[in-house]
């Protein structure tokens, strides 16, 4: 499905140094769009240099703006003159001290602040929000109780909280707030992208996203004794970026969109890597659930026995037909995604050969 991108209309991408944001910006500037990108510190060359390089080597341009998710009004300058806003900025961290402070407040207040700036603008036509599949479900065992045992866009996560799966809770409350704000006005439309676990290389060449942790643990020996038996949806980052852009420029796009290629396990990912990267300590077997239940909380405090019981050994399925039919997404092979991701992490020295 071909889409027409209006090069004369500017676009804003929040969280410009993020994993998904980098690819959205790259695709937009290569199409000739002038992009505003918000970052924490525009003067930090180590973190924003790749964005400036995109601006130099593409028909479009990137202009950086400083913004803080928690600071009201900090997005106003970046929004000015933009027709499309891609709100990707939200904390995705697996280790934190205070879930309310570190995850929930930035996700919720950041969404409120960017949409307040959007509503104050006269130029914005559409907002594309980066939500997540975890705004649809809380734990994998819930798949057994939904129609056809398959997650769909009509389902909402009702089981996560600040104390159980707080990241999932942060994405849920942020998306609900976005819909509440969008439905209370008529100046701009909202389209939501709900990706599963995002894999693939980064635009910056630096593996900084929590999405890279699974790859890191397979390559650094953490999973050498075996991989945990959990299944989750996975998708290439370039497909997620493509979905955002299509959601912006396809006029009749609406609602939520599950963007997930297929369900997979760490062990299946390891098998994809073993032929090409056999010199690394990749897991060769899957651990039994009882063993993960026993030692998991000792190894990782966020891996509670409740999380293990409700997510390990359960089937995970999601219906991605809307993303294919309404957005025209053609998914890349996960084999390509994980190999390119792993190779990039080797190139930057993330782990050593065994």
Region roles according to the model:
Residues 87, 91, 96-167, 191:
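Conserved Rossmann-fold NAD(P)-dependent oxidoreductase catalytic core, especially the SDR/UDP-sugar
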Residues 160-190:
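Active-site Tyr-X1-5-Lys
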Residues 3-34:
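N-terminal Rossmann NAD(P)H-binding glycine-rich loop of SDR-like oxidoreductase domains
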Residues 184-188, 200-214, 247-257:
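Glycine/proline-rich active-site loop of Rossmann-fold NAD(P)-dependent oxidoreductases
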Residues 296-328:
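Conserved C-terminal active-site "lid" loop/helix of NAD(P)H-dependent oxidoreductases
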């Amino acid at each position: 499905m071909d889409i027409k991108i209006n090069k004369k209309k500017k676009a804003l991408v929040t969280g410009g140094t993020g994993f998904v944001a980098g690819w959205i910006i790259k695709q937009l500037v290569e199409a000739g769009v002038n992009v505003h990108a918000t970052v924490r510190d525009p003067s930090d060359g180590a973190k924003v240099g790749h964005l400036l390089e995109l601006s130099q080597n593409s028909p479009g341009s990137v202009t950086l703006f400083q913004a803080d998710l928690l600071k009201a009004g900090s997005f106003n300058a970046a929004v000015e003159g933009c027709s499309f806003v891609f709100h990707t900025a939200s904390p995705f961290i697996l280790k934190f001290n205070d879930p309310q402070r570190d995850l929930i407040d930035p996700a919720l207040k950041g969404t409120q602040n960017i949409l307040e700036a959007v509503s104050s603008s006269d130029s914005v036509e559409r907002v594309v929000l980066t939500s997540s599949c975890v705004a649809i479900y809380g734990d994998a065992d819930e798949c057994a109780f939904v129609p056809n045992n398959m997650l769909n866009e009509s389902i909402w996560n009702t089981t996560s909280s600040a104390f159980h799966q707080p990241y999932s809770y942060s994405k849920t409350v942020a998306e609900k707030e976005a819909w509440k704000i969008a439905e209370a006005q008529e100046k701009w439309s909202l389209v939501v992208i709900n990706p599963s676990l995002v894999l693939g290389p980064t635009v910056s060449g630096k593996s900084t996203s929590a999405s890279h942790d699974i790859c890191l643990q397979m390559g650094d020996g953490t999973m050498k004794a075996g991989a945990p038996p959990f299944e989750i949806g996975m998708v290439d980052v370039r497909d997620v970026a493509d979905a955002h852009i299509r959601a912006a420029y396809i006029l009749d796009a609406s609602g939520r969109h599950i963007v997930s290629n297929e369900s997979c396990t760490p062990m299946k990912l390891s098998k994809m890597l073993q032929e090409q990267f056999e010199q690394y300590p990749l897991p060769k077997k899957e651990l039994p659930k009882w063993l993960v239940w026993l030692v998991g909380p000792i190894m990782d405090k966020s891996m509670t026995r409740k999380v293990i019981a409700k997510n390990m050994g359960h089937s995970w399925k999601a219906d991605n037909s809307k993303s294919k039919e309404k957005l025209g997404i053609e998914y890349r092979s996960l084999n390509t995604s994980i190999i390119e991701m792993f190779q990039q992490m080797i190139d930057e020295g993330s782990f050593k050969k065994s």
